[in-house]
C-alpha cells in the first residue's frame, strides 16, 4: 500500500511591517550662510559657525515600511539595506568635512535638517518605490531630526 500523499499549502496574509537599520558616522561641518555678514552668522549659528569647523558623531536610523513578501517573509533584505546605507551615507560622509569634501553640501548649508534630507534622497533612489522610507539622524543624543519624504 502506498502512503497517502498531500501537499501542504501555507496561506500567509500579506501584512505591513516596518524594519529599521542603524548606522553611525563621524563628520565635521560649519553652519554658514554666505549672503550674511560674519556678525549675522555668528549671532545666528553661534559656535556652529566656527570658521575651523566642528564635528559630530552622527547616529542614523533608517526605517522602511511596506508589505511583507508572502513567499520569503521579508520586507527587504537587511544585508541589502545595510549595503545601501554604507554606499549612500557612510562611505561618502564618514570622517569627511561635509562643507569641503562632499558635493552634496558645497552649496547647501549642512544643518541637521539638510543632512537628513540629503540622506533620504540618496537612499530613496535605492529603496523600491512601493516601500515608504523614513530617516532619523541624531546629531547629539538629545538633538535629532527626521525626514519622511
Q: Model-derived features: where do they sit?
A:
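Intrinsic disorder/low-complexity segments
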Residues: 1-12
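Charge-rich, low-complexity N-terminal segments
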Residues: 12-149
Amino acid at each position: 500500500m502506498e502512503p497517502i500523499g498531500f501537499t501542504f499549502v501555507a496561506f500567509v496574509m500579506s501584512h505591513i511591517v516596518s524594519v529599521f537599520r542603524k548606522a553611525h558616522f563621524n563628520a565635521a561641518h560649519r553652519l554658514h550662510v554666505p549672503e550674511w555678514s560674519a556678525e549675522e552668522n555668528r549671532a545666528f549659528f553661534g559656535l556652529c559657525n566656527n570658521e575651523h569647523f566642528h564635528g559630530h558623531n552622527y547616529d542614523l536610523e533608517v526605517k522602511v515600511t511596506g508589505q511583507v513578501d508572502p513567499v520569503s517573509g521579508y520586507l527587504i533584505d537587511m544585508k541589502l539595506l545595510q549595503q545601501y546605507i554604507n554606499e549612500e551615507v557612510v562611505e561618502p560622509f564618514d570622517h569627511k568635512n561635509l562643507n569641503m569634501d562632499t558635493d552634496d553640501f558645497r552649496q547647501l548649508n549642512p544643518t541637521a535638517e539638510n543632512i537628513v534630507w540629503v540622506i533620504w534622497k540618496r537612499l530613496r533612489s535605492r529603496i523600491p518605490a512601493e516601500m515608504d522610507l523614513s530617516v532619523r539622524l541624531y546629531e547629539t543624543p538629545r538633538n535629532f531630526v527626521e525626514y519622511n519624504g
